[in-house]
Amino acid sequence: AQESAAPTGELPIDRTVVTPARSEDAAVTVRVSIGDGEVLTLPLDKYLWRVVAAEMPASFEPEALKAQTVAARTYTLAKMGRTVQNHPDADVCTDINCCQAYIEPDQAAENWGENTQVYTAKISAAVADTDGVAALYDGAPIQAVFFSSAAGRTVDAVEVWGNAVPYLSGVDSPEGEEVPNYHSTASVPVEEFKRTLLAKVPQADLSGPPSGWFGETVRNSAGGVSSVTVGGAAVTGSALRELFSLRSANFTVTADESAVTFSVTGYGHGVGMSQYGANALARQGKT
């Protein structure tokens, strides 16, 4: 979720058109681009239901679903009133590389099967119970970024995107082995690794044996890779994550004559709210 969102020091919000945080969702209209030039107009509460159903497992604890709803509402309010090149005629779109995930109720029901009635009610309750609630900083909606799971701690925004954002600092996150695919492995054939890396980092020297390609690793406060020396060149963990489709930048790496293997923990950019962390906190009774 929101993998491409990169906060800047000055939040890009038109403060003259932000909807008051305590408005009733049903009174707010959202224009949603669903592709092929089609734009739907939905009340905010109906839109939020579709976002939360797509962004977080409905099996999660009610308080986690509420947290996701507040994040989704805040994110949406921050988008409203801004002109975005990808969807100039709409406030938001359904492309997860630009905005938030989105699913129609009938598709959600197909996914949920016999749990449809319970899950529909849970998400409806999360939206209703947080009606109008948004996270603000200096009176305006924050950039409410989130991701799937952390490796014990979230990451400061400055350590991932290079811009310090006061409310996006690292905190402990209690999820762990209960998270599906919490640990993952990506094995890249040596020739594919060389071709892919050199296209991005042409100054890297990969002429020697693969076992000697990797040097010093610098890690951030959450244990993720800030940078690693590859063939004598410093490469960011985020760049390696993108190049080789790793689930996160929290990884170790080994190499032999046949493959470069990444052992990865967690999923996502690591900044903001961890969804599985929120669920773990909810199970502890946190609200």
Model-derived features: where do they sit?
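Conserved, single-site charged/polar hotspot
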Residues: 1-287
